[in-house]
Curated annotation (Swiss-Prot):
<comment type="subunit">
    <text>Interacts, and probably forms a ternary complex, with MukE and MukB via its C-terminal region. The complex formation is stimulated by calcium or magnesium. It is required for an interaction between MukE and MukB.</text>
</comment>
<dbReference type="InterPro" id="IPR036390">
    <property type="entry name" value="WH_DNA-bd_sf"/>
</dbReference>
<feature type="region of interest" description="Leucine-zipper">
    <location>
        <begin position="208"/>
        <end position="236"/>
    </location>
</feature>
<dbReference type="Pfam" id="PF17192">
    <property type="entry name" value="MukF_M"/>
</dbReference>
<keyword id="KW-0226">DNA condensation</keyword>
<comment type="similarity">
    <text>Belongs to the MukF family.</text>
</comment>
<dbReference type="GO" id="GO:0005737">
    <property type="term" value="C:cytoplasm"/>
</dbReference>
<dbReference type="GO" id="GO:0009295">
    <property type="term" value="C:nucleoid"/>
</dbReference>
<dbReference type="InterPro" id="IPR005582">
    <property type="entry name" value="Chromosome_partition_MukF"/>
</dbReference>
<dbReference type="GO" id="GO:0007059">
    <property type="term" value="P:chromosome segregation"/>
</dbReference>
<dbReference type="GO" id="GO:0006260">
    <property type="term" value="P:DNA replication"/>
</dbReference>
<keyword id="KW-0106">Calcium</keyword>
<keyword id="KW-0131">Cell cycle</keyword>
<keyword id="KW-0159">Chromosome partition</keyword>
<dbReference type="Pfam" id="PF03882">
    <property type="entry name" value="KicB"/>
</dbReference>
<dbReference type="Pfam" id="PF17193">
    <property type="entry name" value="MukF_C"/>
</dbReference>
<protein>
    <recommendedName>
        <fullName>Chromosome partition protein MukF</fullName>
    </recommendedName>
</protein>
């Protein structure tokens, strides 16, 4: 943000001496926003006390407050905003009893944050960057021409300080507002998924795509102009290297370079973080869908029931008792009804026992990676394991390998938010998507 010429103790003493304080409950803030909105509709930029009372009446009605004491409460609210330096009051003998009010810079700043700054516009950003590029080019040309100290102050330092730096601060503020909007979108998505994830999928997709598009649009605009801006800053910096009396210009250029680097780098980092969050939400939705194994049958059954009178149907089933006992926990006890008695010399192993044996074997073989600190490429390891088993067991073995591998450690590349490449793990089209595990 903007640099401060005063030290921290000086600023603290100044604020204490002037008794600065801001207290804006929701009704006071709403009143201030109403004043700013109505004030924006007037060419002269000023409002009478009667107009302020009318604005307060709208706020009072919205908060369902009594109308009997509205004049007194409006007067208190106006005086409160004047006391907090959010409104300026002007009186004269001609307009005695009917003062004129104007918003202060502080009042404009607060209302501008809540009203205008939340409206992201790529056109607005492009215009700001165009103005910055023009100012920087003019300053760079003046710096290469050279001149006395007055020339440097007027044609180089002043445009950089009071035009370029302020626009950089405005862009930085836009990014911080985008950060806040991302948090609000995340809260909205969390509420949607907590209510009904099926109905929320389309809404979540819309919120995710809109935010991703806005971030990408912002970053593309910054990337397109960033190199030209840095080039002009370097031109000014090169022109000051031969002068010992231009430290103030050199320091300002360095600050602007740091701001520009921070703006561009944070824009890219925000996109990477949002990509990671996007993947997290989609993974949650996919997991929820995978848990609903019968979703297709259930959906068709609901549709069939709803359209029964238009398209009647009949359900035919066999072995009614068996159908009713499908979820019977003791069903395994009746296996002999199907298989009959087994010969004494025939050994039978349950799938769970085989799975436990495989898991123990795979766990022992994978432990070597953790003990020696060797990076574990899940694609190569899974392919080696699957080559030892018949095709019918590939799915179960691959699942065990993945389960055991993720228990050993994590991949630091997962924290970048970038997707891993798909790697084939057998000759039948099976693939796995995972980063190399390198932190145990």
């Amino acid at each position: 943000m903007s640099e401060f010429s005063q030290t921290v103790p000086e600023l603290v003493a100044w604020a204490r001496k002037n008794d600065f304080s801001i207290s804006l409950p929701v009704d006071r803030l709403s009143f201030l926003l109403a004043v700013a909105t109505l004030n924006g509709e007037r060419l002269e930029g000023e409002m009478s006390e009667g107009e302020l009372v009318d604005a307060f009446r709208h706020v009072s009605d919205a908060f369902e407050q009594t109308s009997e004491t509205i004049s007194q409460r409006a007067n208190n609210a106006i005086n409160d905003l004047v006391r907090q330096r959010l409104l300026n009051r002007f009186t004269s003998e001609i307009t005695e009893g009917n003062a004129i009010y104007r918003l202060t810079p502080l009042g404009i700043g607060i209302t501008d944050y809540y009203i205008r700054q939340r409206e992201f516009s790529t056109l607005r950003l492009s215009m700001q960057l165009s103005i910055v590029a023009s100012e920087l080019k003019r300053a760079a040309d003046a710096a290469e021409e050279g001149g006395d100290e007055f020339h440097w102050h007027r044609n180089v330092f002043a445009p950089l300080k009071y035009s370029v730096a302020e626009i950089f601060d405005s862009i930085d503020l836009t990014q911080r507002i985008m950060d806040e909007q991302q948090q609000l979108v995340k809260d909205d998505i969390a509420q949607l998924l907590n209510k009904d994830w099926r109905a929320a999928i389309s809404s979540c997709e819309l919120l995710l795509s809109e935010t991703s598009g806005t971030l990408r649009e912002l970053q593309d605009t910054l990337d397109a102009a960033g190199d030209k801006l840095q080039a002009n800053l370097l031109r000014i910096q090169d022109s000051t290297m031969a002068r010992d009396d231009l430290h103030f210009v050199d320091r300002l250029v360095f600050d602007l370079q740091s701001k520009l680097d921070r703006i561009v780098s944070w824009g890219q980092q925000a996109i990477d973080l949002w990509i990671g969050y996007d993947r997290h939400v989609h993974k949650f939705i996919r997991t929820a869908i995978d848990m609903d194994k019968n979703r297709v049958f259930a959906q068709r059954l609901r549709q069939s029931v709803q359209t029964y009178f238009d398209e009647p149907w009949a359900l035919t089933y066999a072995n009614a008792d068996r159908l009713l006992d499908m979820r019977d926990e003791e069903m395994a006890l009746r296996d002999e009804e199907v298989t009959g008695e087994l010969p004494a010399d025939l050994e039978f192993e349950e799938f769970n026992e085989i799975r436990e044996q495989l898991a123990a074997l795979i766990e022992a073989q994978l432990a070597v990676y953790k003990e020696k600190g060797i990076p574990l490429d899940l694609g190569l390891v899974a392919r080696e394991f699957l080559a030892q088993y018949p095709r019918g067991r590939h799915f179960d073995v691959a699942r065990i390998v993945v389960d055991q591998a993720v228990q050993l450690g994590v991949a630091q590349a997962d924290f970048t938010g970038l997707p891993a490449k798909w790697q084939p793990i057998n000759d039948y089209g099976a693939k796995v998507q995972a980063h190399v595990i390198d932190k145990y």
